[in-house]
């Protein structure tokens, strides 16, 4: 069996560790000899900004933005016509599949004209006679 060519996750993990380790070496340092020689005025940018104004809590009722679901999400279906063929078991389409349904066979000869009745033509009863 041929071995599949799949991407090695160990290679991905090693590459990720090396990339992160290289990125840690290139951390931005402010201009100067070391990081500890920052002036006291550098922090004033953040301390002089005023805090955001406090808002009063919203206690009123919120409007409902969801549309209500229609309880009738299905339409009634038309009754189906099952065509019954000779020597074939009749299995209704909407049977309970958990119940062991025993299919039964329709008789040969009485199949067609009893379930699909036709009009019998009477001789001499044409509408063209006068």
From Swiss-Prot:
Name of the molecule in the record: Odontogenesis associated phosphoprotein
Function summary: May promote nucleation of hydroxyapatite.
Primary localization: secreted
Pfam family, one: ODAPH
Region forming the signal peptide: 1-23
Tissue specificity as recorded in UniProt: Highly expressed in placenta.
Entry keyword annotation includes tRNA processing: no
Disease connection: Amelogenesis imperfecta, hypomaturation type, 2A4: A defect of enamel formation. The disorder involves both primary and secondary dentitions. The teeth have a shiny agar jelly appearance and the enamel is softer than normal. Brown pigment is present in middle layers of enamel.
Keyword entries, A-Z: Amelogenesis imperfecta, Secreted, Signal
Biological processes, Gene Ontology terms: positive regulation of biomineral tissue development; positive regulation of enamel mineralization
GO CC, alphabetical: extracellular region
Subcellular location: Secreted
Superkingdom in the source lineage: Eukaryota
Lineage: Eukaryota, Metazoa, Chordata, Craniata, Vertebrata
Organism: Homo sapiens
Record-linked InterPro entries: ODAPH
């Amino acid at each position: 069996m041929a071995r599949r060519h799949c991407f090695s996750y160990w290679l991905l993990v090693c590459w990720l560790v090396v990339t992160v380790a290289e990125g840690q070496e290139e951390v931005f340092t402010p201009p100067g000899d070391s990081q500890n020689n920052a002036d006291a005025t550098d922090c004033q940018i953040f301390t002089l900004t005023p805090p955001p104004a406090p808002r009063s809590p919203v206690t009123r009722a919120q409007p409902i933005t969801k549309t209500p679901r229609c309880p009738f999400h299905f339409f009634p279906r038309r009754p189906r016509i099952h065509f019954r063929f000779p020597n074939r078991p009749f299995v209704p389409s909407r049977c309970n599949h958990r119940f062991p349904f025993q299919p039964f066979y329709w008789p040969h000869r009485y199949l067609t004209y009893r379930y699909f009745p036709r009009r019998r033509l009477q001789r001499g009863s044409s509408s063209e006679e006068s």
